[in-house]
Each structure stands twice: as structure tokens, then as C-alpha cells.
Design a protein with these regions (language model features):
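Charge-dense, helix-prone N-terminal extensions
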Residues: 2-123
Length: 123
């Protein structure tokens, strides 16, 4: 970050790091239920995030509806998810104004959104 100024931040998130972070969470599995292009991450069978292999600069994540709107207003890299219910799903572009810390927190939030709706026996 040398020479970038005081307000600069380094963004390094990519599809591999996103995958590794998702899989680091407890009881997360991955599969490709739609086709060989879309990798989804699940907690007890429930999807909380996904990435498309042919668009590796973008991830889709579950989100609380109110928070989803706030994030879209605050960050140009966060939009309602294409082909998903935009009320509950955001898509986040890597290497724009959402830094790695924010993206990891959004993965955690997506995971928590699924976790809180699991039956007690699965928690």
C-alpha cells in the first residue's frame, strides 16, 4: 500500500479466498446443484452463499432484508442478486469498494441468517 495515501485500502479477495473462508465455518459443505458452473455453500443443506465459476469476481450471499437495502445504498459493489430473491440475497463484487473485512463479515452474516432458522436439534 506504499504510496497509496491514507484513505487507500488493499483488496485481495478472490474466489479461492472466498471459498476457503466459507469452508472454514463450522459444518459448511459445498456442492454444485444447478450445474458445473455454480458452487454453493450450505449449512445443514441450506444455501447461504454461492459463486459462479464463469464470473469469479462476484459472490451471492443471503442477507437480512433491511440490512440488504442499507448495504446496497452504502456500497456500489453490492446489488440485489441476479436470479435470486433480491429481498433476501445480495451479490457482492470483489475488488471494488467492499473490502475483505466487509466481505468476510457478510459471509458471517449470511451463515448466521441460515443458522438462526435451523431447528434446535441441528444447532
Amino acid at each position: 500500500m506504499q504510496g497509496l495515501g491514507n484513505n487507500a485500502f488493499c483488496i485481495i479477495m478472490n474466489i479461492e479466498e472466498f471459498r476457503e473462508y466459507c469452508l472454514s465455518l463450522p459444518k459448511v459443505t459445498e456442492d454444485m446443484p444447478f450445474d458445473e458452473n455454480v458452487l454453493v455453500f450450505r449449512l445443514h443443506g441450506k444455501i447461504f452463499a454461492c459463486v459462479a465459476m464463469d464470473n469469479p469476481d462476484l459472490a451471492t450471499m443471503k442477507c437480512d432484508p433491511e440490512k440488504a437495502i442499507e448495504l446496497r445504498e452504502q456500497y456500489s459493489s453490492i446489488e440485489g442478486a441476479f436470479h435470486w430473491n433480491k429481498k433476501f440475497w445480495n451479490q457482492v463484487w470483489f475488488n471494488q469498494d467492499a473490502d475483505d473485512k466487509l466481505i468476510r463479515s457478510l459471509v458471517d452474516h449470511a451463515y448466521d441468517e441460515v443458522y438462526k432458522k435451523l431447528p434446535k436439534r441441528l444447532k
